[in-house]
Amino acid sequence: MKQYNDLFKIIHREGYIFIASFALVSFLLASFNEKLGCIGFIATIWCIYFFRNPDRFVPISDDLVISPADGIIQEIKEASPPPELGLGDLEMIRVSIFLNIFNIHVNRIPANGKILALHYNPGKFFNASLDKASLYNERQSVLMETDQGQKIVFVQIAGLIARRIVCDLEEDNEVKMGERYGIIRFGSRVDVYLPLKTALLVSKGQTAIGGETIIADFGRKKTEEFKFERK
């Protein structure tokens, strides 16, 4: 029984219906045409691959902010967070992480703290790599306060292909860095907004690993040896 539980654990629950549907269609196609069945089988394998949900080795520190998603650091710039969160024209550092269809799309909490506000904003589906996607695309915005008293924002943004954002958070949730909190289907972007004086530890073009890559440090000794735990 444990082996079956472990198997389901490594696949995000949002993928179950897709995988089952692909498998059923593949079986039906194979009964009519072997080549079509093979194509369906390959599509089913890809679907399993897309919804993979592996454990990560998460750093243990209240001063760190980690990447909430796998992908490429596409842009780092000063920008105001989504207006629906009520922060006004406050300028923050925005780190944008672009996910292609081959990246893991499970999203993780970037820091230890408490969820202050959430807001879902329906919108368009421009290519997530475009700068205007942050403003116009469908998005789920989250405002949290870290255990060190810093306010940060992270935003799930739908892309050209992605048509569903899943966020399992609620206001007043106490959250831990690296915990899974949602997923975006299929190809997307995640923005992280940090206070202007935050020391960044990533650069544009860098590959980020959700739950592991440290993107910022709120001020502990830079020589500190960080510990990690599996989640």
Curated annotation (Swiss-Prot):
InterPro entries listed in its UniProt record: PS_Dcarbxylase, PSD-A
UniProt key word Lyase: yes
Cofactor: pyruvate
Cofactor remark from the record: Binds 1 pyruvoyl group covalently per subunit.
GO terms, molecular function: phosphatidylserine decarboxylase activity
Positions of modified residues (Pyruvic acid (Ser)): S188
Lipid bilayer topology: Peripheral membrane protein
Pfam families (alphabetical): PS_Dcarbxylase
Residues at the active site: S188
Site (Cleavage (non-hydrolytic)) residue list: G187, S188
Pathway membership: Phospholipid metabolism; phosphatidylethanolamine biosynthesis; phosphatidylethanolamine from CDP-diacylglycerol: step 2/2
Annotated compartments: Cell membrane
Record GO cellular component, one term: plasma membrane
Gene Ontology process terms (BP): phosphatidylethanolamine biosynthetic process
Keywords assigned by UniProt, alphabetized: Cell membrane, Decarboxylase, Lipid biosynthesis, Lipid metabolism, Lyase, Membrane, Phospholipid biosynthesis, Phospholipid metabolism, Pyruvate, Zymogen
Catalytic reaction(s) noted: a 1,2-diacyl-sn-glycero-3-phospho-L-serine + H(+) = a 1,2-diacyl-sn-glycero-3-phosphoethanolamine + CO2
Post-translational modification: Is synthesized initially as an inactive proenzyme. Formation of the active enzyme involves a self-maturation process in which the active site pyruvoyl group is generated from an internal serine residue via an autocatalytic post-translational modification. Two non-identical subunits are generated from the proenzyme in this reaction, and the pyruvate is formed at the N-terminus of the alpha chain, which is derived from the carboxyl end of the proenzyme.
Enzyme nomenclature, EC number: 4.1.1.65
PANTHER family associated with the record: ARCHAETIDYLSERINE DECARBOXYLASE PROENZYME-RELATED
Family statement: Belongs to the phosphatidylserine decarboxylase family. PSD-A subfamily.
HAMAP family, A to Z: PS_decarb_PSD_A
Record text on subunit structure and interactions: Heterodimer of a large membrane-associated beta subunit and a small pyruvoyl-containing alpha subunit.
Task performed by this protein: Catalyzes the formation of phosphatidylethanolamine (PtdEtn) from phosphatidylserine (PtdSer).
Name of the protein in its database record: Phosphatidylserine decarboxylase proenzyme
Organism in which the protein naturally occurs: Rickettsia prowazekii (strain Madrid E)
